[in-house]
Regions:
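Cleavable N-terminal export/targeting peptides
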Residues: 1-47, 342-344
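Transmembrane beta-barrel domains of Gram-negative outer membranes and organellar outer membranes
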Residues: 37-245, 254-343
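Short helix/strand-bridging catalytic loops that position acidic/His residues to coordinate divalent metals
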Residues: 251
């Protein structure tokens, strides 16, 4: 077959140009993906006692449009180590908590939505102790004595004159199911304020540390808004009150009236990616002089969100106990969320 001189080089150039056009079209297509609205990171304090209480995670104040669904799946893995005591109390938390939660929201009517959350919990010795010890050693950080105890062992214990509890055997099952009703009562071009009423049912086994064994109720006020400047920032916050029910496992120890609050900032640095920083805090779950159960908790979270497809996003985040011992040493979290584009 006869080929004109220079034809091969021309064909290669045409093929290269075609490939470049395809790549450019693919990248442009990614940039054109419709993305959904901003949302705080899903954060729960999974400390063995605080995790039993029905404290709600932050969510945006925007309400799901009438007739629409928002669906999310959240996964968390928390590692605990606290060993503390005084003349009248002794506390030991050593283990890991795994939690997977299905979250469903449904738009009941204009400015009203209903949210259902169904969690599955696992309490065990886990597998992260060695990794965390190596991390502390690498950075020369204090480990609070965790390297001197056996690794990957489950041992939750508390004892005082007022009561005691313990868990040494691995457990896993459904946790406490929660239901909440939210109403947006203020809205303008850049912000929304909503109120929520929530109820946590004592469906988890309290003796296995899968729930409190009691019903809790809360009220929350939430806001969401865009930064009033050219910066691509969104802000979210919540403040609320929870009334805890009578828990058999915490009998004689628990605090019944708990406040909670949180603030999140979402920086959308590209159309399909954002970085989120978040603070969450709540009142101590027990009447105790020991920080691990009697101190007000402060958690800090840093995460990233990828809007990988129309109406879909995935979050990856790490939670640290800013106030040491009031939350797990570290919690690794991931969420996948579907939210209709009309959801804001």
């Amino acid at each position: 077959m006869f080929i004109l001189p220079g034809c091969k080089s021309v064909c290669r150039a045409l093929q290269k140009a075609h490939a470049q056009r395809l790549l450019a079209g693919f990248v442009a297509g990614l940039g054109a993906l419709p993305t959904v609205g901003s949302e705080p990171l899903y954060v729960k304090n999974l400390s063995p006692v605080a995790g039993l209480i029905g404290l709600p995670s932050q969510r945006d104040a925007q309400i799901t449009p009438s007739g629409d669904w928002v669906v999310a799946l959240h996964g968390s893995l928390a590692n605990h180590y606290v060993n503390d005591g005084n003349a009248t109390e002794a506390l030991n938390f050593d283990g890991e908590t795994g939690r997977v939660a299905l979250e469903l929201r449904y738009g009941l009517a204009e400015n009203w939505d209903l949210q259902l959350e169904v969690p599955w919990l696992d309490q065990s010795g886990g597998d992260l102790d060695g990794l965390i010890d190596d991390w502390h050693d690498f950075w020369g950080m204090s480990d609070g004595g965790r390297s001197s105890v056996p690794k990957d062992v489950l041992d939750y214990r508390y004892a005082s004159a007022q009561g005691d509890f313990s868990l040494q055997d691995d457990t896993s099952a459904i946790g406490d199911v929660s239901l909440s009703l939210s109403h947006a009562f203020y809205r303008d071009e850049n912000s929304t304020v909503s109120a929520a009423l929530g109820y946590k049912f004592g469906t988890g086994d309290d003796k296995d540390f899968l729930g409190s064994g009691a019903d809790d109720a809360y009220i929350a006020l939430r806001f969401s808004g865009e930064q009033l400047s050219d910066l691509p920032l969104s802000w979210h916050g919540q403040v609320g009150y929870l009334r805890a029910g009578d828990s058999d496992v915490l009998d004689g120890l628990q605090e019944k009236n708990l406040w909670f609050a949180g603030l999140a900032m979402d920086w959308r640095f590209t159309r399909n990616w954002s970085v989120i920083g978040q603070i969450d805090s709540h009142a101590a779950p027990l009447d105790s002089e020991l920080t691990g159960v009697g101190g007000d908790a402060i958690l800090g979270t840093l995460g990233t969100r990828w809007y990988f497809a129309p109406q879909w996003s995935v979050d990856i985040s790490v939670v640290e106990d800013i106030r040491v011992e009031t939350a797990p040493d570290v919690t690794f979290q991931a969420s996948v969320r579907y939210r209709p584009a009309s959801g804001g």
